[in-house]
Amino acid sequence: MGQHGAIRLQNEVQEGMPPPHELTEEEQWAEEHRKMHEKHKGHEAMHMEMMVIFMISVIVGQIFLVTWKRKHFKSYQMCTLIGMLTIPVYVCFNRSWYRFLATWLVFCIFSAFIWLKASAQHISGGTPRFVYKWFLFLHKLSYVLGVVGYLIMMGALLGFHVLFGVSQPTLMDAGILFMFYGVYYGVLGRDFAHICTARMASRIGYYTPEGLPKKHLEDGVCAVCGGRLDDSEHVHDADAVVTTKMVEDEDEKLYKLSCGHVFHEFCIRGWVVVGKLQTCPYCKERVDLQRMFKNPWEKPHLFYGKLLDWIRYLVCWQPLIVTAVQGLTTWMGLE
């Protein structure tokens, strides 16, 4: 009798208990992590084989990419651009990240418009400066987004999230989001700028990849855009900025390179900083960037450009290498 009463009391307590609460995102991640450890327990040797395969694949892939870029740069550049445009879009579409897809669509529409202007048979005098200003704006915008994202991430790590009343993972995700948008569109902008730069300069006629201009550059003409320079302006030294003057109703400086050729500010900045062409647009002489950009606040843009070149490998080629390694390990029966 007592045992039956005890059993009835236990059932009543269980029926009166509240239902289990839904797991939070952190708890779900911890549970999945625990299950994965239980599943792969005792597979240390297999995991070591997979790590060796991955390291060898990364090294071989890096050597292949460097050789490909050195031997056939145009095909490497085009394949990289296609990968940069398609791989993140495929991932975001599968995960229903429509905010990125909307920004990607807007970027592609503007880039297509710029490409059409740069590829026209007859390029107007203001088109080159407009194109370079657009890509220089993208470069600076990506730089600002990257810095803001980095500062937000550092604030999350230092505990500043309590000042905004948000959780640390939320603030960290916001920082990563800003940084991703900055570096991704910065890389795409530099690739588009490099393609448009060479194509537009070849249309104007003062530049060819072989270094033999199609027509002679007259004095007082910018070799990038073909626009006139003010002959009355006075050059102070070989690498100094010429006195500010009005160029098409805008205050714009002139730059004179060590080779003696003078260019509009936005033209040479777009050519060197954004277009990644560190040579004179006319005579192919190498440009000394340290002497050209003397102000300390200008040099981070150059370092950021080099960082974007490295990010290109992580965004485009690293996912392909990881996918290939996963396919190889699955074919070999490794888990």
From Swiss-Prot:
A zinc finger (RING-type) spans 222-284. E3 ubiquitin ligase which accepts ubiquitin and transfers it to substrates such as the beta-integrin subunit pat-3, promoting their degradation by the endoplasmic reticulum-associated degradation (ERAD) pathway which is a pathway involved in ubiquitin-dependent degradation of misfolded endoplasmic reticulum proteins. Negatively regulates the unfolded protein response to reduce endoplasmic reticulum stress. Required for the cessation of distal tip cell migration at the end of larval morphogenesis. Plays a role in germline and gonad development. It catalyses: S-ubiquitinyl-[E2 ubiquitin-conjugating enzyme]-L-cysteine + [acceptor protein]-L-lysine = [E2 ubiquitin-conjugating enzyme]-L-cysteine + N(6)-ubiquitinyl-[acceptor protein]-L-lysine. It is a multi-pass membrane protein. This is E3 ubiquitin ligase rnf-121. PROSITE patterns: ZF_RING_2 (PS50089). It comes from Caenorhabditis elegans. Keywords: Endoplasmic reticulum, Golgi apparatus, Membrane, Metal-binding, Transferase, Transmembrane, Transmembrane helix, Zinc, Zinc-finger. The chain crosses the membrane at residues 48-68, 73-93, 100-120, 144-164, 169-189.
